[in-house]
Amino acid sequence: MSESQRHEAREDGFTTPHESGLSSEDAAELEELRREAAALREQLENAVGPQSGLRSARDVHQLEARIDSLAARNAKLMDTLKEARQQLLALREEVDRLGQPPSGYGVLLASHEDDTVDVFTSGRKMRLTCSPNIDVKALKQGQTVRLNEALTVVEAGTFEAVGEISTLREILSDGHRALVVGHADEERIVWLAEPLVSVEHLPDNEVAGPELDDDRPRRLRPGDSLLVDTKAGYAFERIPKAEVEDLVLEEVPDVSYSDIGGLTRQIEQIRDAVELPFLHKDLYREYSLRPPKGVLLYGPPGCGKTLIAKAVANSLAKKMAEVRGDDAREAKSYFLNIKGPELLNKFVGETERHIRLIFQRAREKASEGTPVIVFFDEMDSIFRTRGTGVSSDVETTVVPQLLSEIDGVEGLENVIVIGASNREDMIDPAILRPGRLDVKIKIERPDAEAAQDIFSKYLTEELPVNEDDLAEFGGDRSLTIKAMIEKVVDRMYAEIDDNRFLEVTYANGDKEVMYFKDFNSGAMIQNVVDRAKKYAIKSVLETGQKGLRIQHLLDSIVDEFAENEDLPNTTNPDDWARISGKKGERIVYIRTLVTGKSSSANRAIDTESNLGQYL
């Protein structure tokens, strides 16, 4: 190779064989490439004209632009290829997932030291192995587990949430099994799931007691409803008895004796019957005196029977707190308000079962010495005299159930039964005898003095009073309210023509005029005051004059009497005699004496008719 050729080769970027240390074959190939490069350079020099420099620069720019475009396109193709690869992998995973064999489920019965478990699945009890990912020691009896196609436990689930409802009869001695009663009184032994067993072994300070209804778990007791899987033979959960919850209202009422007006004598009677035995148990034991088991409050409607029962529970709780040295604000007592008519059920035996559950709950809450009052409102609706049923004979079994609960073999301690009724003559005599409902208190209609006391509970000094009425009594608000009450009571109880209501004719020919006052009640007095307050509000809106006036109360009395003119339209004569309380004769004829009534108001009373409001 000449010196000039070596120089050209260096300019082309090639090295000589001696410089590179190549083999003879590589050197020959390199020499061939040099010749080709020289020939191409010569062709290029021959082809380039005068404007070759400008054209070459333009071609370079075009090539660079094309290279950039191809590079961007290549990047997009790479991204598309990557996304397609990811989608392909996802589809492959989905195909693999869809192609997996189905998994089965079972209920864990027991676990063993060799990491095997007993599982109930597909109606069979089987011993299976567990996946290495499963902590066998963490599995709990009754828990749901997932099995693969090889019947290996691969996942631990929760406890079963659906099943049949059975009633707990008793827990067996081992503490892990229970006797339950299902449909058609079918008895069976079931295992208790881990949550139920753990509650049974909790310390007493971590378990809700009979007197507490908080969120803490409580131990099982006979009568509880359990969620049971009859096939697996497991009870998983305690289900609250909603049917009894709807019938029973557990609370400490906020009504005190000071909220009740016109019933001083009746309040004293019921306090002697209910509070003394609880507050002075030692004296009762010293005199061998048995506390009463029940109290009957009877009388016309709207006169405060339910109010007295609530006040008894409130007062009893506070007095017991004082005796124990507890805070009166945290006093505990229970007032089980039984909605009488809702106890009735079309299925035979259901009403009796509800009564048993109610008294069972009362005994549980009274076991810690906390007073419990079981209040039956409208007692005549469910405990009527046996044999008097027209369309059914349900009372023939309901009444004996109550009798056995009150004074049966299993006695009641710290439980008082209070019944309220405005048809005491319909209650079975066996319930009213001494030893059951010992104390019978009549809640009478208020007289003028009692009416003033009741008005004072609703007309208080905090109410806004009209300036004109205040000025009449020298601006003394207390005197103004007192005068209002006296005037409205005098108007309500005055034996004037405007207050005449009915003329009653008895079977012996005697006649008696009955006034609206003979049908007055605490509820009517409250309605009169509420109506007067409404008139005062309308007066503010219409005339701008603020405050309650005596005239508002007097107008309310007139309107209240007018609304009651047509109410006693179909009434049994014997009931009318009992309401009036003056004659024992049977009523054969009544005549309304309300001003403006036509002669059509005169009517004879049929002895077989429905009952009016006032009974």
From Swiss-Prot:
<dbReference type="InterPro" id="IPR003960">
    <property type="entry name" value="ATPase_AAA_CS"/>
</dbReference>
<dbReference type="InterPro" id="IPR003593">
    <property type="entry name" value="AAA+_ATPase"/>
</dbReference>
<dbReference type="GO" id="GO:0019941">
    <property type="term" value="P:modification-dependent protein catabolic process"/>
</dbReference>
<dbReference type="GO" id="GO:0000502">
    <property type="term" value="C:proteasome complex"/>
</dbReference>
<comment type="subunit">
    <text>Homohexamer. Assembles into a hexameric ring structure that caps the 20S proteasome core. Strongly interacts with the prokaryotic ubiquitin-like protein Pup through a hydrophobic interface; the interacting region of ARC lies in its N-terminal coiled-coil domain. There is one Pup binding site per ARC hexamer ring. Upon ATP-binding, the C-terminus of ARC interacts with the alpha-rings of the proteasome core, possibly by binding to the intersubunit pockets.</text>
</comment>
<feature type="region of interest" description="Disordered">
    <location>
        <begin position="1"/>
        <end position="32"/>
    </location>
</feature>
<dbReference type="InterPro" id="IPR050168">
    <property type="entry name" value="AAA_ATPase_domain"/>
</dbReference>
<dbReference type="InterPro" id="IPR022482">
    <property type="entry name" value="Proteasome_ATPase"/>
</dbReference>
<feature type="binding site">
    <location>
        <begin position="302"/>
        <end position="307"/>
    </location>
    <ligand>
        <name>ATP</name>
    </ligand>
</feature>
<dbReference type="InterPro" id="IPR027417">
    <property type="entry name" value="P-loop_NTPase"/>
</dbReference>
<keyword id="KW-0067">ATP-binding</keyword>
<feature type="compositionally biased region" description="Basic and acidic residues">
    <location>
        <begin position="1"/>
        <end position="13"/>
    </location>
</feature>
<dbReference type="InterPro" id="IPR041626">
    <property type="entry name" value="Prot_ATP_ID_OB_N"/>
</dbReference>
<dbReference type="InterPro" id="IPR003959">
    <property type="entry name" value="ATPase_AAA_core"/>
</dbReference>
<feature type="region of interest" description="Docks into pockets in the proteasome alpha-ring">
    <location>
        <begin position="614"/>
        <end position="615"/>
    </location>
</feature>
<keyword id="KW-0647">Proteasome</keyword>
<dbReference type="Pfam" id="PF00004">
    <property type="entry name" value="AAA"/>
</dbReference>
<dbReference type="InterPro" id="IPR012340">
    <property type="entry name" value="NA-bd_OB-fold"/>
</dbReference>
<comment type="similarity">
    <text>Belongs to the AAA ATPase family.</text>
</comment>
<keyword id="KW-0547">Nucleotide-binding</keyword>
<protein>
    <recommendedName>
        <fullName>Proteasome-associated ATPase</fullName>
    </recommendedName>
</protein>
<dbReference type="Pfam" id="PF16450">
    <property type="entry name" value="Prot_ATP_ID_OB_C"/>
</dbReference>
<dbReference type="GO" id="GO:0005524">
    <property type="term" value="F:ATP binding"/>
</dbReference>
<dbReference type="GO" id="GO:0016887">
    <property type="term" value="F:ATP hydrolysis activity"/>
</dbReference>
<keyword id="KW-0143">Chaperone</keyword>
<comment type="function">
    <text>ATPase which is responsible for recognizing, binding, unfolding and translocation of pupylated proteins into the bacterial 20S proteasome core particle. May be essential for opening the gate of the 20S proteasome via an interaction with its C-terminus, thereby allowing substrate entry and access to the site of proteolysis. Thus, the C-termini of the proteasomal ATPase may function like a 'key in a lock' to induce gate opening and therefore regulate proteolysis.</text>
</comment>
<dbReference type="Pfam" id="PF17758">
    <property type="entry name" value="Prot_ATP_ID_OB_N"/>
</dbReference>
<feature type="coiled-coil region">
    <location>
        <begin position="22"/>
        <end position="100"/>
    </location>
</feature>
<dbReference type="GO" id="GO:0010498">
    <property type="term" value="P:proteasomal protein catabolic process"/>
</dbReference>
<comment type="pathway">
    <text>Protein degradation; proteasomal Pup-dependent pathway.</text>
</comment>
<keyword id="KW-0175">Coiled coil</keyword>
<dbReference type="InterPro" id="IPR032501">
    <property type="entry name" value="Prot_ATP_ID_OB_2nd"/>
</dbReference>
